[in-house]
Amino acid sequence: MWKGLLQSTRAAWRGPCVRAPRLPFFRRYSLCVDPEIAALSGPELEARIAAIPIERYRNFSIVAHVDHGKSTLSDRLLELTGVIAAGGQKQFLDKLDVERERGITVKAQTCTMLYKHKGEDYLLHLVDTPGHVDFRAEVSRSYASCGGALLLVDASQGVQAQTVANFFLAFSLNLTLLPVINKIDLEVADIPRSMDQIESTFELPTDNVLQVSAKTGLNVDQILPNVIENIPGPDGKLEDPLRALIVDSWYDNYLGVVLLTYVRDGVVSRGTKVISHHTGRKYDVKEVGIMYPGSVKTKELKAGQVGYMALGMKSSSEAHTGDTLIKVNSNAEPLPGFAETKPMVFVGVFPGEGMDFADLEESLQHLTLNDRSVTMTKATSQALGQGWRMGFLGTLHASVFEDRLLQEHGAHVIITAPSVPYRVVYHPRGKETEPTIVEIDNPANFPDLQLEKARIQSLEEPMVACTMTLPQEYIGSVMSLCEANRGEQVDMNYLNQTQVLLKYRIPLNQLVEDFFGKLKAASQGFASLDYEEDGYMASKLVRLDMCVNGEVVDALSQVMHVSQAETRARDWVEKFKTFLRWHQFDVIIQAKIGNKILARETIKARKKDVLAKLHAADLSRKAKLLKNQKAGKNRLQTAGRVNIPKEAFSGFLSKT
């Protein structure tokens, strides 16, 4: 039975137009692949693409919340167009191991597809974008290369927070949105609810909403005809001067830095001399091509196409995503919307036990070549030695980077607690008329409030606008959580009779301290979260320092709101005590703000039995030995140093 079942399933994927037999627990679907297109490669593929006019180009992406089936749907579309073999590697466009393990998309990927519709060839460019808020800048750049998007909604979960956020981002860029309800094969699928939410939340008509199952392939063949008929083609012009948008970049051992670009206008080919509008640097184009699904070299890239360019760049610092490439001596205007990505979370990275500094530096540089959004500067800690201060787009971004460091390079590191960029506003001095604003991303640089109190006008912390969707029965617990994290309610709307959309303004510092985990606990896993930057707000900030025998352990210092300091101080000293070894003198652990001690724990000294070999009747010798031991302990208490092992830092930081 099972052998026959597997054979019938394989047959359904291989096509062309083979239907799976009707079985009691299988949906019936067909996957039609044009064998002529599936067999194309090399010069034949390039000639076929060259014959397609720009009017028959369609560039589109998929808008969805995390885990709503975006990568699986991409697989089905690639199989449908013959780009990849049916039943092959899952989540094909998720290239990184960490993406497949976590089931998320981290790096935007693109793939070119050929599709025959009503007897004519169409050139389709699919951009698979991340769904998580940490990668919002990458999503925005990817949308800029598209004319429309599939608005994907999970039938079992309905509209979620990141669905809403990504919808409004796509809507603001004037993308045509096609609603698609996925996972309709699940027993818990609630299609009417999803329909109602699409209509009420996004004000989109539900007459032509596609209902599909990306997992089984059910109705997936209806998607591309709808894309062709409803999403407009690019409006670029071949005869206009070259303008190409840099969407992403990665490093290749042979070509150097490779750019993923969207050619807005004009034509670019090997030998074309281009200039970066942002940096002013000039380059000769070494190679151009498309992703089908891997790199396929072509003679040229034309207006409306998404492909790669190799310019001979040696460092990723030369490639600025969102920048415009134009021909040398051209007067073409740059494409709008360029903005450098700004890190929002900073951590200290130091070599772990047995890790060589030079080897770790090489590993970090290799990873940052493929991730332009990561910033890296050298830093020194008295406790941990030489290391780096690194900036990330968010806590997930930092966590993914750490996983890649371990998986791809076997590098074990110590990562300090995340910090956000605070601002110190100083009063004008002398002839100055405006306050001086200093941004601080390292707690070690936080000013001494006792010494500089007169100079400081205010301390400010970054804020975020949070959007949460949750079942109505959890409103009370989630609102209590937001208020406990210094949140301010902005809005509350009902998506339908059971789902609520909450909007709060919350300090970013509270968000990076496992707010998402607490939100899941408060809603029993049913809530979803999205956020975006929302300026700065004046706040009562302090730096909490950890001291061991009077010496500040700089790697553990954190900036926080004054209301959190006492509770955090007590937790810190109790936890850190469990990671330190005993000594022959008292080890005093303190948490303090300035000179004010908020909490203290003591690891009592262990005594050596100096009387072990002494005769019981020798009282004078006994007294002398005890006196000498006491004097020695007093000297150790004064001059002795506590060497904190790196395992203690790793253990403590992993639990804070």
Swiss-Prot record:
Organism: Yarrowia lipolytica (strain CLIB 122 / E 150) (Yeast)
CDD domains: EF4_II, EF4_III, LepA, lepA_C
Domain tr-type G: 55-235
Catalysed reactions, as listed in the record: GTP + H2O = GDP + phosphate + H(+)
Positions that bind GTP: 64-71, 128-132, 182-185
PROSITE patterns assigned to the protein according to its UniProt record, in alphabetical order: G_TR_1, G_TR_2
Any one GO cellular component localisation term in the record: mitochondrial inner membrane
Biological process according to GO: positive regulation of translation; translation
Location(s) in or outside the cell: Mitochondrion inner membrane
Main location: mitochondrion
Transit peptide: 1-28
Lineage, opening ranks: Eukaryota, Fungi, Dikarya, Ascomycota, Saccharomycotina
Any one GO molecular function term: GTP binding
InterPro entries (alphabetical): EF-4, EFG_III/V, EFG_V-like, EFTu-like_2, G_TR_CS, LepA_C_sf, LepA_CTD, LepA_IV
Functional description taken from the UniProt entry: Promotes mitochondrial protein synthesis. May act as a fidelity factor of the translation reaction, by catalyzing a one-codon backward translocation of tRNAs on improperly translocated ribosomes. Binds to mitochondrial ribosomes in a GTP-dependent manner.
Bilayer disposition of the protein: Peripheral membrane protein
Protein's UniProt name: Translation factor GUF1, mitochondrial
Keywords on record: GTP-binding, Hydrolase, Membrane, Mitochondrion, Mitochondrion inner membrane, Nucleotide-binding, Protein biosynthesis, Transit peptide
EC number: 3.6.5.-
